């Protein structure tokens, strides 16, 4: 009698995991990442921006330390590797998150902030030749122009610019410079490092810079309401841990292009979620302009199949 075929349970589980990561995973990541914008702005009603970030970073460090005790990941082997993590941590956690939170506190719409910082892939593509020797073509320049035109269109569609509205936009541009600088630095000088220790060092850098600034320049009173605790829990667990872990898992599954394409939808998704959570409404002209900006990012980052 013929024997039943042997089924490798481990392989079956790995296949099922890859299937989930390539179908459901990207949309879960998009939701978690996009919701971070309006949820962060909600939390800023209960704490000053740098105080809020300091608490978020401290909790993230605590959670990651506990995970590191269990997992025992590899730590940076030399001073150069430590320095790389510190620089990236400053650019991402202090400049990107710090200026983003200050921008939201100053009154920028979360949909506009999400759109401005989503131009990062275009700027990386345009600036890469100068910093990492990559060649730039007409397609990237076209994407850059469309992205900038769309972003400007969204800002103008919300009303005329004046000193009070220009400040938050400049802070958002500073956040864009921070995340772009981090990507360029990684492309040129970054080293491969375990994600656990990398995130732990970077969040620690964020805390070391933001906490003293909060003590010096902010009133550090926090309204520990259920809403604030919920937003903090979401940003620490949903954004800092689950979303980043999911992103890395999808990358390992070989779906980098699929993840990159979903980033095009972060601005409109953030706009919809900002309407749901905050009641922020974009005029019709702003939606058209956002479409132009998203198209620009898509054109600039699209890689033809070989």
Residue spans for each PLM region:
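C-terminal transmembrane-helix exit sites in multi-pass transporters
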Residues: 63-72, 120-145, 268-287
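Helix-helix packing/entry segments at the starts of transmembrane helices
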Residues: 53-55, 112-119, 185-208, 236-276, ...
């Amino acid at each position: 009698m013929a024997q039943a075929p042997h089924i490798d349970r481990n392989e079956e589980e790995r296949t099922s995991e890859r299937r989930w990561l390539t179908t459901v995973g990207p949309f879960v990541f998009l939701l978690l990442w996009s919701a971070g914008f309006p949820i962060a702005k909600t939390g800023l009603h209960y704490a000053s921006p740098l105080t809020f970030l300091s608490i978020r970073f401290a909790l993230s460090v605590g959670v990651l330390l506990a995970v590191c005790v269990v997992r025992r990941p590899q730590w940076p082997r030399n001073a150069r590797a430590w320095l790389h993590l510190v620089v990236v941590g400053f650019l991402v956690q202090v400049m990107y998150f710090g200026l983003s939170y200050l921008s939201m506190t100053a009154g920028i719409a979360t949909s506009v902030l999400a759109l401005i910082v989503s131009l990062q892939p275009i700027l990386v593509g345009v600036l890469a030749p100068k910093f990492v020797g990559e060649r730039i073509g007409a397609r990237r320049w076209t994407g850059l122009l469309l992205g900038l035109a769309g972003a400007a269109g969204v800002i103008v569609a919300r009303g005329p610019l004046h000193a009070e509205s220009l400040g938050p936009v400049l802070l958002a541009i500073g956040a864009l410079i921070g995340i772009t600088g981090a990507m360029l630095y990684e492309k040129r000088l970054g080293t491969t490092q375990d994600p656990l220790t990398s995130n732990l060092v970077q969040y620690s850098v964020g805390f070391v810079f933001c906490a003293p600034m909060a003590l010096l320049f902010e009133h550090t009173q926090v309204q520990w309401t259920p809403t604030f605790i919920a937003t903090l829990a979401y940003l620490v667990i949903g954004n800092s841990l689950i979303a980043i872990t999911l992103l890395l898992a999808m990358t390992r599954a070989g779906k980098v292009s699929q993840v990159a394409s979903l980033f095009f939808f972060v601005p409109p998704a953030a706009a919809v979620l900002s309407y749901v959570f905050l009641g922020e409404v974009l005029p019709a002209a702003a939606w058209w302009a956002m479409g132009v900006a998203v198209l620009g990012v898509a054109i600039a980052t699209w890689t033809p199949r070989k």
